[in-house]
Protein backbone atom coordinates (compact mmCIF):
# COMPACT_ATOMS: atom_id res chain seq x y z
CA UNK A 1 0.00 0.00 0.00
CA UNK A 2 1.46 3.41 -0.94
CA UNK A 3 1.44 6.35 1.43
CA UNK A 4 -1.05 8.12 -0.82
CA UNK A 5 -3.53 5.33 -0.06
CA UNK A 6 -2.71 5.29 3.63
CA UNK A 7 -4.74 6.32 6.61
CA UNK A 8 -3.75 9.97 6.49
CA UNK A 9 -6.12 10.78 9.35
CA UNK A 10 -3.79 9.03 11.78
CA UNK A 11 -0.82 10.85 10.29
CA UNK A 12 -2.56 14.22 10.50
CA UNK A 13 -3.61 13.53 14.07
CA UNK A 14 0.01 12.87 15.04
CA UNK A 15 1.15 16.08 13.36
CA UNK A 16 -1.65 18.12 14.96
CA UNK A 17 -0.70 16.83 18.42
CA UNK A 18 2.90 18.03 18.28
CA UNK A 19 3.86 20.71 20.79
CA UNK A 20 5.89 23.72 19.68
CA UNK A 21 9.33 22.18 20.36
CA UNK A 22 8.36 18.86 18.74
CA UNK A 23 7.00 20.70 15.72
CA UNK A 24 10.23 22.67 15.34
CA UNK A 25 12.14 19.37 15.30
CA UNK A 26 9.87 17.60 12.82
CA UNK A 27 9.63 20.52 10.38
CA UNK A 28 13.18 21.84 10.79
CA UNK A 29 14.42 23.27 7.50
CA UNK A 30 17.72 21.38 7.58
CA UNK A 31 19.12 18.25 5.98
CA UNK A 32 20.71 17.07 9.23
CA UNK A 33 18.80 17.37 12.51
CA UNK A 34 19.70 16.18 16.01
CA UNK A 35 17.16 16.22 18.83
CA UNK A 36 17.87 16.25 22.55
CA UNK A 37 14.82 14.57 24.07
CA UNK A 38 14.70 14.39 27.90
CA UNK A 39 12.80 11.54 29.57
CA UNK A 40 9.04 11.80 29.08
CA UNK A 41 9.26 14.55 26.44
CA UNK A 42 7.60 12.54 23.66
CA UNK A 43 10.70 11.24 21.91
CA UNK A 44 9.03 8.32 20.13
CA UNK A 45 6.04 10.48 19.18
CA UNK A 46 8.38 13.05 17.64
CA UNK A 47 10.48 10.47 15.80
CA UNK A 48 7.43 8.79 14.29
CA UNK A 49 6.02 12.14 13.21
CA UNK A 50 9.34 12.99 11.55
CA UNK A 51 9.43 9.67 9.67
CA UNK A 52 5.80 10.06 8.59
CA UNK A 53 6.32 13.65 7.50
CA UNK A 54 9.36 12.74 5.43
CA UNK A 55 7.47 9.89 3.78
CA UNK A 56 4.58 12.27 3.01
CA UNK A 57 6.93 14.76 1.35
CA UNK A 58 9.13 12.15 -0.42
CA UNK A 59 6.88 9.34 -1.58
CA UNK A 60 9.55 7.42 -3.50
CA UNK A 61 12.57 7.85 -1.23
CA UNK A 62 14.19 4.92 0.57
CA UNK A 63 13.92 5.42 4.33
CA UNK A 64 15.77 3.55 7.06
CA UNK A 65 14.98 3.91 10.78
CA UNK A 66 17.45 2.37 13.23
CA UNK A 67 16.61 1.41 16.81
CA UNK A 68 18.68 -0.43 19.40
CA UNK A 69 16.33 -3.18 20.58
CA UNK A 70 13.99 -5.63 18.87
CA UNK A 71 11.12 -4.43 21.07
CA UNK A 72 11.61 -0.83 19.93
CA UNK A 73 11.77 -1.97 16.30
CA UNK A 74 8.51 -3.88 16.62
CA UNK A 75 6.78 -0.96 18.32
CA UNK A 76 7.88 1.46 15.60
CA UNK A 77 6.71 -0.87 12.83
CA UNK A 78 3.28 -1.22 14.45
CA UNK A 79 2.85 2.51 14.94
CA UNK A 80 3.94 3.29 11.38
CA UNK A 81 1.47 0.73 10.03
CA UNK A 82 -1.27 2.49 11.99
CA UNK A 83 -0.52 5.50 9.78
CA UNK A 84 -0.59 3.35 6.67
CA UNK A 85 3.20 3.37 6.24
CA UNK A 86 4.55 -0.05 5.27
CA UNK A 87 7.63 0.72 3.19
CA UNK A 88 10.06 2.10 5.77
CA UNK A 89 12.94 -0.20 6.71
CA UNK A 90 12.88 -0.38 10.51
CA UNK A 91 15.83 -2.32 11.88
CA UNK A 92 18.28 -2.68 14.75
CA UNK A 93 21.86 -1.49 14.46
CA UNK A 94 23.28 -5.03 14.34
CA UNK A 95 20.85 -6.25 11.67
CA UNK A 96 21.49 -3.11 9.63
CA UNK A 97 25.24 -3.68 9.83
CA UNK A 98 24.88 -7.36 8.91
CA UNK A 99 22.73 -6.54 5.88
CA UNK A 100 25.26 -3.99 4.64
CA UNK A 101 28.06 -6.49 5.17
CA UNK A 102 26.21 -8.95 2.95
CA UNK A 103 25.75 -6.21 0.32
CA UNK A 104 29.47 -5.34 0.31
CA UNK A 105 30.48 -9.02 0.40
CA UNK A 106 28.50 -9.61 -2.78
CA UNK A 107 29.87 -6.43 -4.37
CA UNK A 108 33.54 -7.19 -3.60
CA UNK A 109 33.33 -10.98 -3.63
CA UNK A 110 34.52 -11.78 -0.13
CA UNK A 111 33.15 -14.21 2.45
CA UNK A 112 31.79 -12.96 5.78
CA UNK A 113 33.45 -14.93 8.55
CA UNK A 114 31.90 -14.74 12.01
CA UNK A 115 32.71 -17.00 14.95
CA UNK A 116 29.92 -19.37 16.00
CA UNK A 117 29.15 -20.34 19.59
CA UNK A 118 31.36 -23.44 19.54
CA UNK A 119 34.34 -21.50 18.20
CA UNK A 120 33.84 -18.72 20.73
CA UNK A 121 33.79 -21.18 23.62
CA UNK A 122 36.93 -22.89 22.34
CA UNK A 123 38.73 -19.55 22.36
CA UNK A 124 37.39 -18.79 25.83
CA UNK A 125 38.67 -22.14 27.09
CA UNK A 126 42.15 -21.23 25.90
CA UNK A 127 41.98 -17.75 27.45
CA UNK A 128 40.62 -19.08 30.75
CA UNK A 129 43.34 -21.74 31.07
CA UNK A 130 46.06 -19.14 30.76
CA UNK A 131 44.27 -16.69 33.09
CA UNK A 132 43.68 -19.25 35.85
CA UNK A 133 47.39 -19.98 36.07
CA UNK A 134 48.34 -16.30 36.19
CA UNK A 135 45.55 -15.14 38.53
CA UNK A 136 45.59 -18.26 40.73
CA UNK A 137 41.83 -18.73 40.41
CA UNK A 138 40.33 -22.21 40.70
CA UNK A 139 37.77 -22.19 37.91
CA UNK A 140 35.53 -20.15 35.63
CA UNK A 141 32.29 -21.46 34.12
CA UNK A 142 32.62 -21.14 30.33
CA UNK A 143 28.85 -20.95 29.80
CA UNK A 144 28.56 -18.08 32.28
CA UNK A 145 31.51 -16.32 30.64
CA UNK A 146 29.96 -16.79 27.19
CA UNK A 147 26.66 -15.33 28.42
CA UNK A 148 28.49 -12.38 29.93
CA UNK A 149 30.55 -11.45 26.88
CA UNK A 150 27.55 -11.73 24.55
CA UNK A 151 25.54 -9.11 26.38
CA UNK A 152 24.19 -10.14 29.79
CA UNK A 153 26.18 -7.82 32.05
CA UNK A 154 23.65 -7.77 34.92
CA UNK A 155 23.54 -11.48 35.74
CA UNK A 156 23.33 -12.71 39.33
CA UNK A 157 27.02 -13.07 40.30
CA UNK A 158 29.32 -11.72 43.00
CA UNK A 159 31.33 -8.54 42.46
CA UNK A 160 34.60 -10.49 42.54
CA UNK A 161 33.35 -12.95 39.91
CA UNK A 162 32.13 -10.04 37.79
CA UNK A 163 35.61 -8.50 37.90
CA UNK A 164 37.04 -11.83 36.77
CA UNK A 165 34.60 -12.03 33.85
CA UNK A 166 35.39 -8.44 32.88
CA UNK A 167 39.10 -9.21 32.83
CA UNK A 168 38.52 -12.31 30.70
CA UNK A 169 36.28 -10.36 28.33
CA UNK A 170 39.06 -7.82 27.81
CA UNK A 171 41.43 -10.65 26.91
CA UNK A 172 38.84 -12.13 24.53
CA UNK A 173 38.40 -8.79 22.77
CA UNK A 174 42.18 -8.42 22.44
CA UNK A 175 42.43 -11.98 21.10
CA UNK A 176 39.86 -11.19 18.40
CA UNK A 177 41.61 -7.97 17.49
CA UNK A 178 45.04 -9.58 17.27
CA UNK A 179 43.73 -12.42 15.11
CA UNK A 180 41.33 -10.35 12.97
CA UNK A 181 38.30 -12.31 14.19
CA UNK A 182 34.68 -11.26 14.69
CA UNK A 183 31.66 -12.67 16.48
CA UNK A 184 28.00 -11.72 16.05
CA UNK A 185 28.35 -8.80 18.50
CA UNK A 186 30.93 -7.25 16.15
CA UNK A 187 28.81 -6.65 13.02
CA UNK A 188 29.09 -2.83 13.27
CA UNK A 189 32.87 -3.04 13.77
CA UNK A 190 33.17 -5.60 10.95
CA UNK A 191 31.17 -3.30 8.68
CA UNK A 192 33.35 -0.30 9.49
CA UNK A 193 36.56 -2.19 8.76
CA UNK A 194 35.19 -3.36 5.40
CA UNK A 195 34.14 0.20 4.53
CA UNK A 196 37.66 1.37 5.40
CA UNK A 197 39.33 -1.36 3.32
CA UNK A 198 37.24 -0.69 0.20
CA UNK A 199 36.71 3.04 0.84
CA UNK A 200 32.97 2.44 0.74
CA UNK A 201 30.04 4.68 1.57
CA UNK A 202 26.41 3.75 2.05
CA UNK A 203 24.42 4.96 -0.93
CA UNK A 204 21.44 2.62 -0.64
CA UNK A 205 19.06 4.92 1.28
CA UNK A 206 17.80 8.49 0.99
CA UNK A 207 16.94 9.21 4.62
CA UNK A 208 18.37 7.87 7.89
CA UNK A 209 16.52 8.13 11.21
CA UNK A 210 18.34 6.99 14.37
CA UNK A 211 16.65 6.47 17.74
CA UNK A 212 18.47 6.43 21.12
CA UNK A 213 21.50 8.26 19.76
CA UNK A 214 23.15 8.17 23.19
CA UNK A 215 23.52 4.37 22.80
CA UNK A 216 25.67 4.74 19.67
CA UNK A 217 29.33 3.78 20.08
CA UNK A 218 32.16 5.60 18.24
CA UNK A 219 32.41 2.97 15.48
CA UNK A 220 28.67 3.09 14.78
CA UNK A 221 28.82 6.88 14.77
CA UNK A 222 31.62 6.87 12.17
CA UNK A 223 29.57 4.46 10.07
CA UNK A 224 26.59 6.84 10.13
CA UNK A 225 28.93 9.59 8.92
CA UNK A 226 29.60 7.48 5.81
CA UNK A 227 25.92 7.21 4.94
CA UNK A 228 25.18 9.50 2.00
CA UNK A 229 21.60 10.70 2.37
CA UNK A 230 19.54 13.80 1.75
CA UNK A 231 18.19 13.59 5.33
CA UNK A 232 19.59 12.51 8.70
CA UNK A 233 17.45 12.75 11.83
CA UNK A 234 19.00 11.64 15.12
CA UNK A 235 17.24 11.72 18.51
CA UNK A 236 18.14 10.74 22.07
CA UNK A 237 19.12 11.89 25.55
CA UNK A 238 22.71 11.95 26.79
CA UNK A 239 21.53 11.64 30.39
CA UNK A 240 20.13 8.20 29.57
CA UNK A 241 23.37 6.71 28.23
CA UNK A 242 23.41 3.45 30.23
CA UNK A 243 25.31 1.14 27.88
CA UNK A 244 28.83 2.41 28.46
CA UNK A 245 29.91 -1.21 28.98
CA UNK A 246 29.03 -1.73 25.30
CA UNK A 247 30.99 1.33 24.25
CA UNK A 248 28.12 3.83 23.91
CA UNK A 249 29.02 7.51 24.00
CA UNK A 250 26.57 9.88 25.67
CA UNK A 251 28.69 12.84 24.51
CA UNK A 252 27.95 12.05 20.86
CA UNK A 253 25.59 15.05 20.67
CA UNK A 254 28.56 17.38 21.05
CA UNK A 255 30.18 15.91 17.92
CA UNK A 256 27.40 16.96 15.55
CA UNK A 257 28.47 20.53 14.86
CA UNK A 258 27.03 20.48 11.34
CA UNK A 259 23.59 19.32 12.54
CA UNK A 260 20.67 21.58 13.35
CA UNK A 261 20.04 21.14 17.10
CA UNK A 262 16.53 21.04 18.60
CA UNK A 263 15.50 20.39 22.20
CA UNK A 264 12.17 18.98 23.34
CA UNK A 265 11.00 21.16 26.22
CA UNK A 266 7.91 19.63 27.80
CA UNK A 267 7.38 16.55 29.96
CA UNK A 268 4.29 14.39 29.44
CA UNK A 269 5.07 11.48 31.76
CA UNK A 270 5.67 12.58 35.31
CA UNK A 271 4.49 15.18 37.79
CA UNK A 272 6.87 18.13 37.87
CA UNK A 273 8.20 17.23 41.32
CA UNK A 274 9.52 13.92 40.00
CA UNK A 275 11.22 15.54 37.02
CA UNK A 276 12.68 18.29 39.23
CA UNK A 277 14.05 15.73 41.65
CA UNK A 278 15.60 13.57 38.90
CA UNK A 279 17.20 16.64 37.31
CA UNK A 280 18.49 17.87 40.67
CA UNK A 281 20.06 14.48 41.39
CA UNK A 282 21.82 14.50 38.03
CA UNK A 283 23.06 18.07 38.16
CA UNK A 284 24.07 17.86 41.83
CA UNK A 285 26.09 14.69 41.38
CA UNK A 286 27.51 15.16 37.89
CA UNK A 287 30.63 17.10 38.87
CA UNK A 288 31.21 14.84 41.87
CA UNK A 289 31.05 11.75 39.67
CA UNK A 290 33.34 13.24 37.05
CA UNK A 291 35.78 14.10 39.85
CA UNK A 292 35.49 10.48 41.07
CA UNK A 293 33.75 11.50 44.30
CA UNK A 294 31.75 8.31 45.03
CA UNK A 295 28.27 9.07 46.33
CA UNK A 296 24.73 7.85 46.84
CA UNK A 297 21.86 9.71 45.29
CA UNK A 298 19.76 9.27 48.41
CA UNK A 299 22.14 10.52 51.05
CA UNK A 300 23.57 13.34 48.98
CA UNK A 301 20.29 14.81 47.86
CA UNK A 302 17.95 14.18 50.79
CA UNK A 303 19.53 17.03 52.74
CA UNK A 304 20.02 19.32 49.78
CA UNK A 305 18.31 22.70 50.11
CA UNK A 306 18.46 22.97 46.34
CA UNK A 307 16.57 19.70 46.02
CA UNK A 308 13.87 20.81 48.46
CA UNK A 309 13.30 24.06 46.60
CA UNK A 310 13.06 22.28 43.27
CA UNK A 311 10.66 19.67 44.56
CA UNK A 312 8.35 22.31 46.02
CA UNK A 313 7.63 23.65 42.56
CA UNK A 314 4.65 22.18 40.76
CA UNK A 315 1.57 20.42 42.08
CA UNK A 316 0.00 16.99 42.30
CA UNK A 317 3.01 14.71 42.34
CA UNK A 318 4.76 13.02 45.19
CA UNK A 319 8.38 12.16 45.78
CA UNK A 320 9.43 10.29 48.90
CA UNK A 321 13.08 9.84 49.77
CA UNK A 322 14.05 7.39 52.51
CA UNK A 323 17.49 8.03 53.97
CA UNK A 324 19.62 5.43 55.77
CA UNK A 325 18.52 7.17 58.98
CA UNK A 326 14.87 6.34 58.29
CA UNK A 327 13.80 9.95 57.89
CA UNK A 328 11.20 10.37 55.19
CA UNK A 329 10.86 13.56 53.21
CA UNK A 330 7.66 13.85 51.20
CA UNK A 331 7.15 16.66 48.70
CA UNK A 332 3.47 16.94 47.85
CA UNK A 333 1.37 19.81 46.43
CA UNK A 334 4.26 22.17 47.03
CA UNK A 335 4.51 21.42 50.75
CA UNK A 336 7.08 19.35 52.65
CA UNK A 337 5.91 16.95 55.34
CA UNK A 338 7.90 14.62 57.56
CA UNK A 339 6.20 11.29 58.06
CA UNK A 340 7.03 7.95 59.61
CA UNK A 341 9.14 6.05 57.07
CA UNK A 342 7.47 2.69 57.44
CA UNK A 343 3.97 4.14 57.29
CA UNK A 344 4.89 5.92 54.07
CA UNK A 345 6.47 2.78 52.68
CA UNK A 346 3.34 0.78 53.44
CA UNK A 347 1.21 3.39 51.70
CA UNK A 348 3.29 3.20 48.54
CA UNK A 349 3.48 -0.60 48.54
CA UNK A 350 -0.33 -0.72 48.65
CA UNK A 351 -0.26 1.01 45.24
CA UNK A 352 1.50 -2.06 43.75
CA UNK A 353 4.48 -0.10 42.45
CA UNK A 354 7.07 -1.31 40.00
CA UNK A 355 10.29 -1.98 41.93
CA UNK A 356 13.43 -1.05 39.99
CA UNK A 357 16.78 -2.57 40.96
CA UNK A 358 20.32 -2.16 39.68
CA UNK A 359 21.17 -5.87 39.47
CA UNK A 360 19.54 -9.20 38.73
CA UNK A 361 20.69 -10.35 42.17
CA UNK A 362 18.54 -7.68 43.83
CA UNK A 363 15.60 -8.57 41.58
CA UNK A 364 15.90 -12.23 42.54
CA UNK A 365 16.03 -11.49 46.28
CA UNK A 366 12.88 -9.37 46.11
CA UNK A 367 11.07 -11.94 43.98
CA UNK A 368 11.94 -14.61 46.55
CA UNK A 369 9.96 -12.54 49.07
CA UNK A 370 6.88 -12.96 46.86
CA UNK A 371 6.86 -9.65 44.98
CA UNK A 372 6.55 -10.02 41.20
CA UNK A 373 6.45 -6.42 39.94
CA UNK A 374 10.20 -6.01 39.96
CA UNK A 375 12.69 -5.31 37.19
CA UNK A 376 16.22 -4.19 36.54
CA UNK A 377 16.60 -0.57 35.53
CA UNK A 378 18.06 -1.59 32.16
CA UNK A 379 14.96 -3.68 31.41
CA UNK A 380 12.70 -0.75 32.33
CA UNK A 381 14.38 1.75 30.00
CA UNK A 382 11.80 3.29 27.69
CA UNK A 383 8.89 2.13 29.87
CA UNK A 384 6.75 4.03 32.37
CA UNK A 385 4.74 3.11 35.47
CA UNK A 386 2.22 4.92 37.65
CA UNK A 387 4.15 4.27 40.87
CA UNK A 388 7.80 3.31 41.27
CA UNK A 389 10.17 2.24 44.03
CA UNK A 390 13.81 2.82 43.12
CA UNK A 391 16.40 0.81 45.02
CA UNK A 392 19.32 3.12 45.70
CA UNK A 393 22.78 2.03 44.63
CA UNK A 394 26.20 3.60 44.98
CA UNK A 395 27.24 5.83 42.10
CA UNK A 396 30.84 5.20 41.11
CA UNK A 397 30.93 6.60 37.58
CA UNK A 398 28.95 8.56 35.01
CA UNK A 399 27.23 5.43 33.72
CA UNK A 400 25.88 4.75 37.24
CA UNK A 401 24.52 8.30 37.35
CA UNK A 402 22.84 7.85 33.96
CA UNK A 403 21.29 4.57 35.16
CA UNK A 404 20.00 6.37 38.27
CA UNK A 405 18.45 9.08 36.07
CA UNK A 406 16.69 6.48 33.93
CA UNK A 407 15.26 4.87 37.08
CA UNK A 408 14.10 8.18 38.53
CA UNK A 409 12.22 9.14 35.36
CA UNK A 410 10.07 6.00 35.00
CA UNK A 411 7.36 7.16 37.46
CA UNK A 412 4.25 9.08 36.44
CA UNK A 413 2.47 9.67 39.77
CA UNK A 414 4.67 8.77 42.73
CA UNK A 415 8.18 7.59 43.43
CA UNK A 416 10.11 6.34 46.42
CA UNK A 417 13.88 6.00 46.62
CA UNK A 418 15.24 3.73 49.32
CA UNK A 419 18.36 1.90 50.40
CA UNK A 420 18.19 -1.77 49.33
CA UNK A 421 18.92 -3.29 52.76
CA UNK A 422 16.27 -1.09 54.39
CA UNK A 423 13.77 -1.95 51.70
CA UNK A 424 14.42 -5.68 51.93
CA UNK A 425 13.95 -5.58 55.71
CA UNK A 426 10.72 -3.65 55.28
CA UNK A 427 9.39 -6.13 52.72
CA UNK A 428 9.97 -8.99 55.13
CA UNK A 429 7.93 -7.27 57.84
CA UNK A 430 5.37 -6.01 55.31
CA UNK A 431 4.83 -9.54 54.02
CA UNK A 432 4.11 -10.76 57.55
CA UNK A 433 1.22 -8.33 58.07
CA UNK A 434 -0.52 -8.70 54.69
Listing of model-derived features with the role each one plays in the protein:
Residues 10-27, 31-36, 163-251, 266, ...:
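Conserved helicase NTPase motor core
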Residues 1-107, 355, 409:
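P-loop NTPase Walker
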Residues 47-51, 72, 76-80, 172, ...:
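Structural preference for long, well-ordered alpha-helical segments in enzyme cores
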Residues 121, 129-140, 144, 161-164, ...:
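Catalytic phosphate/metal-binding cores of nucleic-acid and nucleotide-processing enzymes, i.e., regions
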Residues 106-177:
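ATP-hydrolysis module of ASCE/P-loop NTPase motor domains
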Residues 310, 332-350:
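Conserved interdomain hinge at the start of the Helicase C-terminal
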Residues 89-95, 183-191, 370-378:
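Conserved two-lobed SF2 helicase motor
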Residues 41, 70, 207, 214-323, ...:
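Conserved helicase motor core of SF1/SF2 NTP-dependent helicases
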Amino acid sequence: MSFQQANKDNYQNKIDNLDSSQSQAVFADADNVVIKAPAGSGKTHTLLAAVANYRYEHLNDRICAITFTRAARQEMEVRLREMGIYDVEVTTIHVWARNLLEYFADKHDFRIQVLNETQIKQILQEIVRDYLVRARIRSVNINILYTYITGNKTMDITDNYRRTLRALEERYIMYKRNNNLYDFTDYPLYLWNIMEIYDEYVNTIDALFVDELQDVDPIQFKTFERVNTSKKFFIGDGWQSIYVFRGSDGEVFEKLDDFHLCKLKYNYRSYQEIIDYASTVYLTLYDKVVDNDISSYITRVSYSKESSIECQKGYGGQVAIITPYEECYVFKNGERAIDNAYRQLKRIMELNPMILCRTNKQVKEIQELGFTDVSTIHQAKGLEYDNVVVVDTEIDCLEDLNVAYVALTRAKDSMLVINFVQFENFLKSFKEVI
